[in-house]
UniProtKB/Swiss-Prot annotation:
Record's protein name: Homologous-pairing protein 2 homolog
Gene name of the encoded protein: Psmc3ip
Gene3D superfamilies (UniProt xref): Winged helix-like DNA-binding domain superfamily/Winged helix DNA-binding domain
Subcellular location, record wording: Nucleus
Species whose genome carries this gene: Mus musculus
Subunit-level organization: Interacts with the DNA-binding domain of the nuclear receptors NR3C1/GR, ESR2/ER-beta, THRB and RXRA. Forms a stable heterodimer with MND1. Interacts with PSMC3/TBP1.
Region (DNA-binding) location: 118-182
Coiled-coil annotated spans: 84-152
Lineage of origin: Eukaryota, Metazoa, Chordata, Craniata, Vertebrata
PTM notes: Phosphorylated by PKA, PKC and MAPK.
Length: 217
C-alpha cells in the first residue's frame, strides 16, 4: 500500500463519520465508497473496515438486510425536533418548491426566447433581405401598373395570378416586418440606448424612413 493510500485509510473513520453525520441518511458500503473515493482516495477495503470499526465503537448504527449492511448516523446525537420545527420545515419546503417551479418556468421562457432569437436572421441578413424584397416589390408594382394600363393584353388568368402574387408578397412583407420588429424589441430590452440610436448604429432603415406604406391586403 502506498504512503498516500495508507494515510487515507488511517483517516477513513473520521472522514466517514463526518460524512454520515452531515448527510444523515442510510448508505451501503458501496455507496460510501462511491461518494468518497474520488475526493479522499479511499479504497473499498478501507471503507468497509472503517464502517465496521465505527459500528463496533457505537459511533454509527448498522442494519443488515439480507446480505447487505446499511450504515447511518446514530440518531441519539441529534437534537429532538419539535412539531413546530417540523411544521416550519414543511412550510419552507413548500415555499422553496414553489420558488423552484417559478424559476424553472422562467428558464423555459428564456430558453424559448433564446431559441427564437438564435434562429432569427442576423442584422446584415435582414438588411439584405429587405433590399431584395424592396427590389421585388418595385418590379411587381411596375408590372402591375403596366398590366392595369393595358388590360386588353392581359388574360383574366394572368391578372388573377398577378393579384395572387401581390397578396403573397404583401403577406410575406408583413410577416418579415413583424419578425424584425419582435427581434429588435427583444434586443432593445437589454440595450442601454434608445431605439433610434440602435437603428442608427446598426444601419437599420425602416419603411417609415422612406415613406413606404404597406399595401392594403
Amino acid at each position: 500500500m502506498s504512503k498516500s493510500r495508507a494515510e487515507a485509510a488511517a483517516g477513513a473513520p473520521g472522514i466517514i463519520l463526518r460524512y454520515l453525520q452531515e448527510q444523515n441518511r442510510p448508505y451501503s458500503a458501496q455507496d460510501v465508497f462511491g461518494n468518497l473515493q474520488k475526493e479522499h482516495g479511499l479504497g473499498k477495503a478501507a471503507v468497509v473496515k472503517a464502517l465496521d470499526q465505527l459500528a463496533q465503537e457505537g459511533k454509527i448504527k448498522e442494519k443488515t438486510y439480507g446480505k447487505q449492511k446499511i450504515y447511518f448516523a446514530d440518531q441519539n446525537q441529534f437534537d429532538t425536533v419539535s412539531d413546530a420545527d417540523l411544521h416550519g420545515l414543511d412550510a419552507s419546503i413548500v415555499a422553496l418548491t414553489a420558488k423552484v417551479q417559478s424559476l424553472q418556468q422562467s428558464c423555459r421562457h428564456m430558453e424559448a426566447e433564446l431559441k427564437e432569437l438564435t434562429s432569427a436572421l442576423t442584422t446584415p441578413e435582414m438588411q439584405k433581405e429587405i433590399q431584395e424584397l424592396k427590389k421585388e416589390c418595385a418590379q411587381y408594382t411596375e408590372r402591375l401598373k403596366n398590366i392595369k394600363a393595358a388590360t386588353n393584353h392581359v388574360t383574366p388568368e394572368e391578372k388573377e395570378k398577378v393579384y395572387r402574387d401581390r397578396q403573397k408578397y404583401c403577406k410575406e412583407w408583413r410577416k418579415r416586418k413583424r419578425m424584425t420588429t419582435e427581434l429588435c424589441d427583444a434586443i432593445l430590452e437589454g440595450y442601454p440606448k434608445s431605439k433610434k440610436q440602435f437603428f442608427e448604429e446598426v444601419g437599420i432603415e425602416t419603411d417609415e424612413d422612406h415613406n413606404v406604406l404597406l399595401p392594403d391586403p
